[in-house]
Regions:
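Conserved small-residue
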Residues: 1-424
Length: 424
């Protein structure tokens, strides 16, 4: 969406369209200011994006490294889990409607006592994509050149091309299309993994369609049917799934899964439609009211476990709290009990923003929470929606000595009045 072309004759290739590249992009118009983003001049530039980059924060002289073995897609996050045998796995979701869940298992093992020995773990290993079966089981399908149709006859010349065209490789293997997979969090003691599925307005639309096996579907263009892992059509409010690797082995190629929660609004009048029957797939399906135990929320995005095993959920819904969101209100960060599912709202956001990113000091007494793009969805001026974080200092005029106050992203620091552990 950040690339574009002023050439009216520009037509994206099937590979470019699979990654959302188009002549007009998302309207950012970067290509008009920087030729790097002009597809007419730099056709290969989009292939340099979509990779996980590793940075060593302790070494100022270090050079960031693109970890290409983890695949090329819209990595919303990456989380790792170290097994009891010191094998390690890295999990990541592709932040797009109808995309996939991935796992990378290095060939080597993690050495807890030698950080230098771990620096090259991400160079060699196996990238997998998930298939979630309706019976609650799942499979990790290897994205390996020469296997499962990833061959020159199907457009893959070598492992490098499999990685550059990760989405097409996953299409070829028949992975499960998910409702916009985003953040993943690992329980610090049980090893269970949780993933947010933010929304999917195309789920259950007619005529039904899937990502084409030959990889020629444009990004977010298919209308997948509902299934056990994505059981609601027009999944406005999203849900969170949970899975466990077989044998608690991070390198396992099988897992079991269930839905942790289906988000929603208990007071909404929105219905699933006369042609859809709640209760399919073993009773997992609920209406748009959701099955939250506690405070309502929707569009789950950020996800994080604190040191004490509490699950923190951050939302990325339409930021003006109207329409389907009028009862829920603005975006928020909530805390959930992973055992009971009980959820309580912890904080709400400024207007028209996303709450994203959270960490804490090791003692759990100070939280750092990201506030992203306040004032989004503006029509004429961003000042109509937000002047955060300066709005509290400039009064109703929203003016400073230097002119109009514009909204900015930022990080807030949160502590308890009594200095105690947050969440207690």
């Amino acid at each position: 969406g950040y690339f574009g072309s002023n050439d009216p004759a520009f037509v994206p290739t099937a590979h470019e369209a699979r990654y959302g590249v188009s002549r007009t992009g998302f309207g950012y118009r970067w290509h008009e200011a920087d030729p790097r983003f002009d597809l007419t001049q730099n056709r290969n530039e989009p292939n340099r994006f979509g990779w996980i980059v590793e940075i060593d924060p302790w070494n100022r002289a270090s050079v960031p490294v693109k970890r290409t073995a983890l695949g090329r897609f819209k990595h919303e996050s990456v989380i790792y889990v170290v097994g009891s045998d010191n094998r390690i796995a890295f999990y990541s979701g592709d932040d797009e409607r109808n995309e996939y869940l991935y796992k990378f298992v290095p060939a080597g093992s993690y050495d807890r006592n030698d950080p230098i020995a771990n620096r090259n773990l991400l160079d060699t290993g196996t990238l997998y994509v998930a298939r979630l079966n309706d019976d609650g089981t799942g499979e990790w399908l290897p994205l390996v050149f020469g296997q499962n149709g990833l061959t020159p006859e199907n457009g893959f010349a070598d492992q490098g091309e499999v990685l550059v065209k990760t989405r097409q490789a996953a299409d070829r293997l028949g992975a499960t299309m998910m409702d916009r997979p985003e953040w993943i969090a690992a329980h610090p003691t049980t090893g269970e993994l949780f993933m947010t599925l933010t929304n999917n307005s195309r789920r259950g639309n007619t005529p039904a369609s899937s990502n084409k096996v030959d990889g020629t579907s444009a990004a977010a263009s298919a209308n997948p049917a509902v299934n056990a892992a994505n059981p609601r059509p027009d999944n406005d409010f999203g849900h969170i799934i949970r899975w466990r690797e077989n044998g608690s082995d991070v390198a396992a190629t099988g897992f079991s899964w269930d839905i942790f929660v289906q988000c929603g609004d208990k007071a909404t009048a929105k219905t699933l439609g006369s042609t859809y029957t709640p209760g399919e797939f073993g009773g997992q399906t609920v209406g748009y009211q959701g099955n939250i135990v506690g405070d309502d929320y929707g569009a789950p995005d950020g996800l994080w476990f604190d040191y004490f095993g509490r699950l923190w959920i951050q939302t990325d819904q339409v930021g003006n709290a109207t329409g389907d969101w009028v009862n829920i209100g603005g975006n928020a960060m909530l805390c959930a009990n992973p055992d009971t599912g009980e959820t309580r709202r912890f904080m709400t956001s400024p207007r028209n923003c996303e709450v994203t990113g959270v960490t804490s000091t090791p003692d759990g007494r100070t939280f750092f929470v990201g506030i992203q793009h306040p004032g989004e969805d503006w029509v004429n001026t961003v000042l109509e929606n937000s002047t955060w974080p300066d709005s509290g200092f400039n009064g109703p005029t929203r003016m400073s000595a230097n002119g109009p106050v514009k909204p900015r992203s930022g990080v807030v620091v949160i502590t308890k009045n009594d200095g105690g552990v947050i969440g207690t």
